[in-house]
């Protein structure tokens, strides 16, 4: 028999802002076999639930708690029963399950990220069941759904590391008594892209949109293959990515981007009698600059 502890009970001087619990990093490899042709999705899923009652917090009454081990098992079973066509749909399936199965669940939040496996391919021929890990950007999504509400769907790219050796500069910035940074017309530009966007609706080709955003990120960072494109600041490149994404992809409502400025500094070799003309550089992990920005579509004018 459960014993509830009422030593504290409800405190009139504090109130709950938000509560939640769940299971993080539930890993699954789903294999779809169509004869000898196999397709895979490997994902890590994190689930957070909010319950109507707060009696578990107030009194130690666990009677409404769905064990986190059950949450883990549910993720496994839904992968078996529903498959993983794409991670956004899988996340919506998980939200739908908990909200429809348990009346006392008021909110479900699901985060899923996909391991970047790519099918072996040579001379245009794709292997039927072999894959290679290609860390050229991780596909992730977040879906949050309130009871009696629609799912709010975000997708994103993270861990997309890019570098260009020219066509970047930083000039005309504010200077005060603490400024030692020199202006530069030509420098290396390296960053690790974090990009997250919200969809206006759910009847979209999520994987096609993700691929299109990734292509836009690479296009605006690098520019034309034969000559590149000049970047006067990380901020300008970030904004250009957002504007092109929202102009070309009407399914996207808003977009958040974070671009750390990963530094590569010229190594002074003058004491060794050598002139190093930006040929040998020192990568510095930290400290680093960090540039962020979020844009959304403007509401149409009522005039």
Curated annotation (Swiss-Prot):
Record function comment: Catalyzes the oxidation of uric acid to 5-hydroxyisourate, which is further processed to form (S)-allantoin.
Catalytic activity, as annotated: urate + O2 + H2O = 5-hydroxyisourate + H2O2
N6-acetyllysine sites (modified residues): 10, 23, 27, 36, 118, 122, 164, 175, 185, 220, 227, 277
Post-translational modification as stated in the protein's UniProt record: Acetylation of Lys-118, Lys-164 and Lys-290 is observed in liver mitochondria from fasted mice but not from fed mice. May be deacetylated by Sirt5; however it is unclear whether Sirt5 mediates deacetylation or desuccinylation of Uox; additional evidence is required to validate these results.
Modified residues (N-acetylalanine): 2
GO BP terms in the entry: adenosine catabolic process; allantoin metabolic process; amide catabolic process; AMP catabolic process; dAMP catabolic process; deoxyadenosine catabolic process; deoxyguanosine catabolic process; deoxyinosine catabolic process
Name listed for the protein in its UniProt record: Uricase
Disulphide bonds in the chain: none
Residues recorded with modification Phosphoserine: 39, 63, 231
Keywords on record: Acetylation, Mitochondrion, Oxidoreductase, Peroxisome, Phosphoprotein, Purine metabolism
Active-site residue list: 23 (charge relay system), 68 (charge relay system), 263 (charge relay system)
EC number: 1.7.3.3
Membership in a protein family: Belongs to the uricase family.
GO terms assigned for molecular function: urate oxidase activity
Principal subcellular localization: other
Places the protein is found: Peroxisome; Mitochondrion
EC top class, as a word: oxidoreductase
Motif extent (Microbody targeting signal): 301-303
Modified residues annotated as N6-succinyllysine in this record: 10, 23, 220, 227
Keyword set includes Oxidoreductase: yes
């Amino acid at each position: 028999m459960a014993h509830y502890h009422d030593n504290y009970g409800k405190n009139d001087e504090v109130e709950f802002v938000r509560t939640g619990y769940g299971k993080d990093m539930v890993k699954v490899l789903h294999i779809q076999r169509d004869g000898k042709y196999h397709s895979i999705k490997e994902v890590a899923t994190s689930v957070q639930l909010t319950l109507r009652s707060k009696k578990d917090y107030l009194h130690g009454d666990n009677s409404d708690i769905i064990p986190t081990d059950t949450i883990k098992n549910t993720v496994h079973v839904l992968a078996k029963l529903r498959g993983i066509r794409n991670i956004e749909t899988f996340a919506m399936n998980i939200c739908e399950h908990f909200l429809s199965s348990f009346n006392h669940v008021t909110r479900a939040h699901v985060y899923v990220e996909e391991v970047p496996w790519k099918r072996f391919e040579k001379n245009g021929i794709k292997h039927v069941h072999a894959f290679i890990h290609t860390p050229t950007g991780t596909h992730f999504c977040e879906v949050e759904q309130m009871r009696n509400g629609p799912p709010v769907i975000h997708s994103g790219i993270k861990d997309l590391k890019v570098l260009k050796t020219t066509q970047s500069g930083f000039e005309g910035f504010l200077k005060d008594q603490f400024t030692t940074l020199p202006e530069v017309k030509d420098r290396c530009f390296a960053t690790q892209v974090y990009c997250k966007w919200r969809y206006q609706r759910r009847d979209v080709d999520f994987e096609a949109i993700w691929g299109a955003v990734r292509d836009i990120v690479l296009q605006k960072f690098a520019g034309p293959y034969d000559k590149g494109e000049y970047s006067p600041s990380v901020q300008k490149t970030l904004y250009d990515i957002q504007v092109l994404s929202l102009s070309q992809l009407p399914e996207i409502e808003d977009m958040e981007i974070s671009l750390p400025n990963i530094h590569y500094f010229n190594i002074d070799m003058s004491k060794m009698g050598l002139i190093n003309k930006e040929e040998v550089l020192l990568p510095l992990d930290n400290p680093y600059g960090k540039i962020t920005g979020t844009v959304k579509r403007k509401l149409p004018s009522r005039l």
